[in-house]
Amino acid sequence: MVLDGFAAHFDAYLENIVREGKSEHTVAAYRRDLEELFALLAQMPSEAEGGVPQGLSRRDFTAALRRLSQRGLNARTLARKLSSWRQYCVWLVERGLLHTDPTADIKPPKQPERVPKALPQEWLNRMLDLPVDGGDPLAVRDHALFELMYGSGLRVSEIHGLNADDVYLDEAWVHVTGKGRKQRQVPLTGKSVEALKNYLPLRQTASDGKALFTGRNGTRLSQRQIQKRLAQWAAQNGDGRHVSPHMMRHSYAGHLLQASRDIRAVQELLGHSSLSTTQIYTKLDFDHIARLYDEAHPRAKRQDE
């Protein structure tokens, strides 16, 4: 069966990307995407015969994408899945296990431009300036976590992966391992340094003692736990609005761009490999400028106001 030949090297491929240093989260995502692809291809009649993967065609992969689209998956998710499939096909071609990449000329679904949601700067300042119960280690930890999240614009995966020795309080910077294991240094705000100094003496540690943010049992906080703590904090102290780590990162980027106008510096701080990824925040900046214009310029007001 054609599919058997195509899927036969699946485990070897996963072992290879583990050796390349991909994170557990990335490897798990590749596994899910490829297992889903194999299941979809198994439901399709193939024109080829024999036990080699050569018979799979572009048509098979576009049909798989179409079925996922019919299930309601959005363009962004479909594009990510196609990327996972393509990387597997390229790996097979490079090793002589596949003559050509059947996904090579498949264009990913066009994604609508999404402007990130940023939280109001005044709201964030008010929330982060709320009194912290110094007798509650979890409250002190969460305050340091949220200050770092907004003050340095880290991804939730990056915060999850931080170790205590990644933080340099005297120099006011943090060593971050980002996507693709890329390393960068990000400055710490004065508020973050103060919050971390309050938290570190109270930090619970397990046997290895490495993780920066830990739970009561001393083990590293999971990404889901970080998301949950942030949502609970916002719900209990805010005005009912939904808050996520991604929104905190978007707020950091948008507010920094408004203040600095230096998109290259913001790109470096965010750990974006491509400037085009950072450029979406210029839309946030334009919205801010447009509001100021409407409020301040005498010719911007409508006649009926």
Curated annotation (Swiss-Prot):
Pfam family, one: Phage_integrase
GO cellular component, one term: cytoplasm
One of the protein's GO biological processes: chromosome segregation
UniProt cross-references to CDD domains, sorted A to Z: INT_XerDC_C
Residue ranges constituting the Tyr recombinase domain according to the UniProt record: 114-294
Boundaries of every Core-binding (CB) domain copy: 1-93
InterPro entries the record matches: CB (IPR044068), DNA_brk_join_enz (IPR011010), Integrase-like_cat_sf (IPR013762), Integrase_catalytic (IPR002104), Integrase_recombinase_N (IPR010998), Integrase_SAM-like_N (IPR004107), Recomb_XerC (IPR011931), Tyrosine_recombinase_XerC/XerD (IPR023009)
Keyword terms of this UniProt record: Cell cycle, Cell division, Chromosome partition, Cytoplasm, DNA integration, DNA recombination, DNA-binding
Localization in the cell: Cytoplasm
GO MF terms, alphabetically ordered: DNA binding; tyrosine-based site-specific recombinase activity
Catalytic residues of the enzyme: R155, K179, H246, R249, H272, Y281
UniProt record similarity statement: Belongs to the 'phage' integrase family. XerC subfamily.
Subunit structure: Forms a cyclic heterotetrameric complex composed of two molecules of XerC and two molecules of XerD.
Known role: Site-specific tyrosine recombinase, which acts by catalyzing the cutting and rejoining of the recombining DNA molecules. The XerC-XerD complex is essential to convert dimers of the bacterial chromosome into monomers to permit their segregation at cell division. It also contributes to the segregational stability of plasmids.
Record protein name field: Tyrosine recombinase XerC
